[in-house]
């Protein structure tokens, strides 16, 4: 099972990367990490997409 985490996944470039991962065959799960909640979360019928709202800078303090 291949799991990818995309930081900034609700922003312009991050959303594009998530869309590319959705279309990839070997991806089972995508974890989208972003500071703010995504107003229009992406949905896929064949991939598991988990949205995690946090600031990664808070994890290293």
Curated annotation (Swiss-Prot):
A biological-process GO annotation: steroid biosynthetic process
Gene3D superfamilies: NAD(P)-binding Rossmann-like Domain (3.40.50.720)
InterPro entries per UniProt: 3Beta_OHSteriod_DH/Estase (IPR002225), NAD(P)-bd_dom_sf (IPR036291)
GO MF annotations, alphabetized: oxidoreductase activity, acting on the CH-OH group of donors, NAD or NADP as acceptor
Pfam families with a match to the protein in the record: 3Beta_HSD
Record remark on domains: Corresponds to the N-terminal domain of vaccinia virus 3-beta-HSD.
Family in the record: Belongs to the 3-beta-HSD family.
Name of the protein this chain belongs to: Truncated 3-beta hydroxy-5-ene steroid dehydrogenase homolog
Source species: Variola virus (isolate Human/India/Ind3/1967)
């Amino acid at each position: 099972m291949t799991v990818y985490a995309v930081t900034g996944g609700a922003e312009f470039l991050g959303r594009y990367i998530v869309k590319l991962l959705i279309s990839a065959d070997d991806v089972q799960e995508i974890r989208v990490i972003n500071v703010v909640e995504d107003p229009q979360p992406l949905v896929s019928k064949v991939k598991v997409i988990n949205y995690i709202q946090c600031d990664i800078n808070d994890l290293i303090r």
